[in-house]
Amino acid sequence: MAAGDQAADNPEEWGNQLSVLGAEYQALMEDFLSRMVPNDAADSVMEDIRNSFQAGAESLMRNPTLLWETQAKLMQDQMALWQQAMAAASGGAFEPLVTPSRGDRRFKDEAWTSDPGYNAIMQQYLLFSNTVETLVDKLDDLSPGEKRNLSFYARQMVNAMSPTNFVSTNPEVMRKTLETRGQNLVDGLSRLREDLANSAEGLNVTMTDRSAFEVGENIAVSQGAVVMENELIQLIQYAPTTEKVFKTPLLIVPPWINKFYVLDLRPENSLVKWLVDQGHTVFLISWRNPGPEQRDLTWADYMQLGPIAALDGIEQATGEKSANFLSYCIGGTLTASTMAYLTSTRRGRKAKSVTYMATLQDFRDPGEIGVFLSEPVLQGIEAKLEQDGYLDGRVMAYSFNLLRENDLFWSFYVNNYLKGEDPAAFDLLYWNTDGTNLPAGTHGWYLRHLYQENQLVEPGGVELDGVKIDLRKVSTPSYFIATKEDHIAKWNSSYYGALLPKGPVTFVLGGSGHIAGVVNPPHKNKYGYWTNDELPDNHEEWLAGAEAHEGSWWPHWQEWMVKGGYVDADKMVDAREPGGGELPLLEPAPGRFVKTSIPEVLGEAEDDEAAE
């Protein structure tokens, strides 16, 4: 191979590097073994993996012809590949039997196509990968859940085996190793040890240069102030940028699985700033990063201390008794619960409208996240929650990254640990790694009763503070925005949620995924969206009758707000400054809750400083 043609010109230096490499590897193994402690959650995942592959094996035993045909096809392809490799080694031209899919960035290095040896390795791997995928897909006697889980675990196995993940079969890494005389591997092992030490369970790879960003300094910089605080939230009121503002204020309810500033990363892509610039008086809930002390917080507590407390704060700050809601992800699920609760307690008028961004209310099809919610895995999570009082946000991040493992795990594994290079500075990836913990009382209930048992869609299926709620009784006008490629909140599931309220509903489908499709500023003119005034029972029928539009959905939403009368556009008032009402200025936005990291919550940062 091309990389192997280079000579090692200094054997003594190579010997020294191998000694250093050996010492780093030994230290890494000691670190790894020290983390090998009994873990109910990890054990439950292993049980689920065993169950999934056993189900697949039993399916193949019931259909031996499928196994035989698949093996025969793979052997035939391998023979053709061997003949091709022999011809290429003799200098002949060759046409590849298989090539990477369009979105596969692992094999972008030129050597994968120009070097016959590397090309043969790549094709051999792709043939195996495609065979496994096809085989699992043809196991039609498995239940949908069994097939989903087996497909996920098989994909994890196959992608872990990619030749790009190993030194000797990755041309980029081989070149780097020869150029640096192995220093890249020494540096990579050092980075791996550091990341392992900073991970709760599994491995949280470093995705970005974290020193390049500081919350409140160069991200989350929209001007405003914290005007209210309780044990769970800080309520931020943002400073106006227009002389007049809409009479009805706007409350943003973000998710608490991660931090709110994905909606306020930079001024040019900030949804918060855009809303303020349109004339909204924007309030936003900043959730506390919880620890063991918050273990008993319930879904009802999140509702009372979150949206309902925020409504009271907004009335004190502005004098307005109602507000518009703009919610996101699990924040939207909580908001839907809140709408039903307010309706049942005859306070539904406190919300003039409600918007759900990438939100699940009907959990019948959770997508691949369902892999983490099989009964063995869920029982393991519940045991861990009971033991610790919280779910470490780094564990959640690791799980979510495995839903896009090649982009969000293995690419950084190769860059950081095999090439020994620093990741680039990227604000979105900084946010992605700035996680939050999840309290036991809330998260365990959410996973069991909503994700697994889908009780929120049942009339009276959920009881909050003694009140049985029913989403079908909510008459508040609703705007649903789902995104076509969302792997967290699948758009078909979001659509089924839109069929629940009895009030007027507008459903819009955006392009792209869970983040980019939601945070899609108009000036970029990207992704597009679809609209359809009808709401048939089937999501595919809705899409077939939908009209495509270019650009961002944000202006469409703004037009819906104005034309619907939800902002009282004919009753503009003077701009409201934070602190201008009955609520005092507590501290500048974005506040301290959002700046609190997981290590700080758990006392790890202090321990590290003491060790130094």
Outline where the language-model segments fall:
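Conserved alpha/beta-hydrolase "acid-adjacent" motif
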Residues: 487-493
